[in-house]
């Protein structure tokens, strides 16, 4: 039986009582530079039919309403002047005051039953579908631990490359790119350890193996494969537009269908925007985690790339709490953000055959990526644009999301896959 690190186990055991925020530090969501930054910070309690031991802690897949989060948060009322000026000047122009005890308050957040992506019914529909196709999902992120027992069977393989012979067998300019490429170090070393937790976590949400004792991915390894494209690295998960552009081109050249982008920048290049606009892939993008105080803002007014790009091949995702509200840190936008998906206290894979909770729009985007891959695999007669339409046309409407997202709702995988059959 796989075992979680001791600290994670103790967190799991306390889930039905009180949740405390993940100890992992939040990375800045938007930087005043051209570099990309990751969108994460930082746990459902009913076992899924997949038969995975830790699936009972995946509230995003089956929310029974038994969770509570207790935390200290910023008291918005004490910061009203920030919001009054924000729309005019942008966050970089605001002189923020020092924060003291009076700026914070303790609050409880209780889960609401059925605020989840409705995956069980979707799996049933998927299992009844014949003639599925294999879908390749490119994850442009930090690296991914391809040896993780919950991921190893879901990793894409370049069949034209002979592993370890030091020769560029397929002549594509990348030597021994068996599972993807590291565009940070220009090598085939696609996992270097702890710094690749972010990408590994997203990979587990999308396609962790079913019925093997770990967690359950939205899809499984039979018909969905993950292409590992490391374009961000270092302790803060930074990367250049040039690296991401090269990764996009690699993904296209090697047959990727869907691309997950859980990062962003407030100052991207025209070349980067064109790379997405001109691609045939469907991009699922994280909306971003707000300002330096982790308070989300309107990206219709203060755009973030690629989340604010108005292209037909982009789906932008906000971070939904287990009570049906956007997380305070999640960016929003009645035009730019298409829908919300669970992104707070998401349990998934990390390097070293381990598991951890993370929170942020980086965790929400892979939920939609996994859903898109599942539906696209099931419906061989539909285009990727059809899949986007299905997902956005069938959201679970939630009053708190009205005016915050274009659809006013959250991801409903079952409704989306059934919609495609009508």
Predicted regions and their residues:
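Protease zymogen maturation seam
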Residues: 27-136, 144-150, 421
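C-terminal segment of classical bacterial N-terminal signal peptides
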Residues: 16-26
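Substrate-binding/access-modulating region of protease and related hydrolase catalytic domains
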Residues: 124, 129-131, 142, 196-197, ...
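C-terminal subdomain of the subtilisin-like protease fold in secreted/lumenal serine endopeptidases
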Residues: 37, 216, 254-261, 313-316, ...
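Short, small-residue alpha-helix embedded
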Residues: 363-380
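Carbohydrate-associated surface elements
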Residues: 320
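Sec-dependent N-terminal signal peptides
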Residues: 3-16
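Subtilisin-like serine protease catalytic core
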Residues: 29-36, 44, 110, 120-240, ...
């Amino acid at each position: 039986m796989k075992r979680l690190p001791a600290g994670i186990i103790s967190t799991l055991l306390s889930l039905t009582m009180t949740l405390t925020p993940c100890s992992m530090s939040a990375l800045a969501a938007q930087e005043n530079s051209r570099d990309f930054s990751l969108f994460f910070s930082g746990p459902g309690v009913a076992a899924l039919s997949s038969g995975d031991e830790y699936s009972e802690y995946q509230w995003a897949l089956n929310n029974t309403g038994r969770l509570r989060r207790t935390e200290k948060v910023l008291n918005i009322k004490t910061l009203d002047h920030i919001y009054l000026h924000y729309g005019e000047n942008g966050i970089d122009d605001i002189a923020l005051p020092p924060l003291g005890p009076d700026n914070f308050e303790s609050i409880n957040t209780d889960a609401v039953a059925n605020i989840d992506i409705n995956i069980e019914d979707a799996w049933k529909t998927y299992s009844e579908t014949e003639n599925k196709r294999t879908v390749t999902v490119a994850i442009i992120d930090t690296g991914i631990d391809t040896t993780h027992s919950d991921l190893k069977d879901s990793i894409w393989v370049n069949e034209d490359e002979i592993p370890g012979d030091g020769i560029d067998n397929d002549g594509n300019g990348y030597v021994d790119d068996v599972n993807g490429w590291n565009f940070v170090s220009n090598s085939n070393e696609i996992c270097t350890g702890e710094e690749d937790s972010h990408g590994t976590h997203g990979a587990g949400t999308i396609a962790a193996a079913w019925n093997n004792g770990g967690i359950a991915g939205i899809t499984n390894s039979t018909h969905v494969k993950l292409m590992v494209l490391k374009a961000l690295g270092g302790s803060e998960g930074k990367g250049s537009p040039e690296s991401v552009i090269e990764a996009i081109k690699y993904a296209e050249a090697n047959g990727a269908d869907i691309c997950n982008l859980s990062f962003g920048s407030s100052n991207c290049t025209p070349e980067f925007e064109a790379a997405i606009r001109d691609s045939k892939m469907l991009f699922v993008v994280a909306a971003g985690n707000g300002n330096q105080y982790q308070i989300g803002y309107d990206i219709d007014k203060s755009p973030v790339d690629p989340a604010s790009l108005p292209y037909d091949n982009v789906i932008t995702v906000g971070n939904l709490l287990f009570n049906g509200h956007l997380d305070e840190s999640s960016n929003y936008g009645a035009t730019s953000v298409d829908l919300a998906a669970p992104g707070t206290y998401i349990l998934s894979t990390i390097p070293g055959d381990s598991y951890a909770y993370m929170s942020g729009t980086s965790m929400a985007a892979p939920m939609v990526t996994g859903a898109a891959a599942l539906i696209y695999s099931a419906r061989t007669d539909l285009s990727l644009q059809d899949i986007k339409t299905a997902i956005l046309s069938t959201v679970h409407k939630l009053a708190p999301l009205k005016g915050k997202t274009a659809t006013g709702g959250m991801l409903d995988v079952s409704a989306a896959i059934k919609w495609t059959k009508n």
